[in-house]
Amino acid sequence: MMLAEALQESTDSDLQILRYRDDYTIFSNDSEKLKKVISTLHSVLSDLKLSLNERKTEFSDSSSLNILKKDKIASLRLPTSGSLGILKEAYSILMFTSEHPNSGQLCRILIEFSKRLQLEKNKEHVEQHFPQLVSILCEIAIRNRKHAQFPIAIISQLLSRPAIPDQQYKSDLAQQLVDRFKKQVNIGYIEIWLQRALLATGTQEDFNEALCKHVENTNTKPLWNVSWVKQDYLDKIAWNSTEFIDREALCKITPFIEMDEISVFEYC
């Protein structure tokens, strides 16, 4: 509102503002007016003791290209296993994440990659490069913790493949994964999804994340600080127990994590 009022005072209004979630794109036929908008926006934010993020603010004379984020453009260039083998495609995804860490595009990319891994024509390649694929997906999870559930879900799908019958081999590989993740710091979110992937396999692992300990039923400490809540309310809620864990649901989970379980939104 403050920006709109300031612009009405300082410019002729041939501006069009397009908003998508928390992204704003401002269009005009006059580049000088756009520069004036940026200057006005700086001034408005300054009055509020705020500043414009220069790294996320761009000026362009190409509305067709620059309306897309750089990670979106890069994702469109990614080859698929139709032109590459499965292993090379996995490496190309890893390279994408190194250039665009925690990109929202990674969710869509990995969902499509998961579908291709299930195709019969790729069965031989998947079995041939099984440990390498698991290792790459582990690296993707470490580099992109915001979306770690996606590579971990695919790892669970690989470990569930009946074409790899050696259970001891898969158990050893799962343990190597756990050991590799535990070398990292601040992995609470990863541990939650790693526990989900391993729970139905019977693999016993001691995770540090408090939620994981509640699932294991080994945590006697309150999960939340409720010292400020009146006792009358505390008596009505299961705040200091593991009653919020659905034990029946835990008994029904499978080692194979479906993408529907982790995809809250439809990525495109």
Model-based region annotation:
Residues 1, 19-21, 25-26, 41, ...:
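Long, contiguous hydrophobic alpha-helical segments, chiefly transmembrane helices and signal peptides
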Residues 69-268:
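Right-hand nucleic-acid polymerase module
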Residues 1-22, 26-29, 33-36, 161-166:
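Active-site palm subdomain of RNA-directed nucleic acid polymerases
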Residues 12-14, 22, 40, 47, ...:
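Short, flexible coil/linker segments at or flanking structured domains
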Residues 16, 31-88, 92-96:
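Polymerase palm active-site segment centered on the conserved acidic dipeptide of motif C
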